[in-house]
Amino acid sequence: VWLLGSSLFSAQLAAMLGLPFAFASHFAPDYLMRALEVYRAQYRPSAAWPKPYAMVGVNVFAADTDDEARRLFTSLQQQFINLRRGTPGKLPPPVDVLEANELELANVAHSLSFAAVGSRDTVRDKLRDRIAQTGADELIITAQIYDHAARLRSFELAAQIRDELASERR
């Protein structure tokens, strides 16, 4: 059993119950670092989990080039903008230019600021930084990519990156 949350309360609850904690930083990064700090500081060991164990969520959009990955990422950006406008719907196809005002662009950039978007090397470096920044024991990744083949390619690249980063930690 895990506790998934995006608040300080969820971090406190996971700590109190001696559960592993997954933080939803893939859409709510604001309290990530403080939540991990609270979780680790207040952790009460349990029989199954003698020490705190943290996972953080990351949107991963990996492609053969940074430009291609940034274009794929526009689907998720549009979805967030549409949600904030009160017009939720299916994941839209990627676009060359986002149709949004400055405030909407700033809000979506903030909400998705923990994402790793780019080529294999760019994403690897970003994920390495995210692990170092958070001290996460695991990452849970998601990729809301419109095109199925591009989504599969992103996960293939992510798996290669996982293997490379795991070998660095040994």
Language-model features: locations:
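Internal, glycine-rich beta/alpha segment that forms the wall or movable "lid"
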Residues: 1-17, 33-34
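Hydrophobic faces of well-ordered beta-strands that scaffold small-molecule active sites
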Residues: 1-4, 21-24, 52-59, 139-141
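Glycine-enriched alpha-helix->loop->beta-strand junction motifs that scaffold or abut catalytic
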Residues: 13-22, 135
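Active-site-proximal loop/turn and secondary-structure-junction residues that shape catalytic pockets
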Residues: 27, 60-62, 145-147
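An alpha-helical appendage that flanks or caps ligand/catalytic pockets
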Residues: 30-136, 163-169
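Generic C-terminus detector
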Residues: 131-170
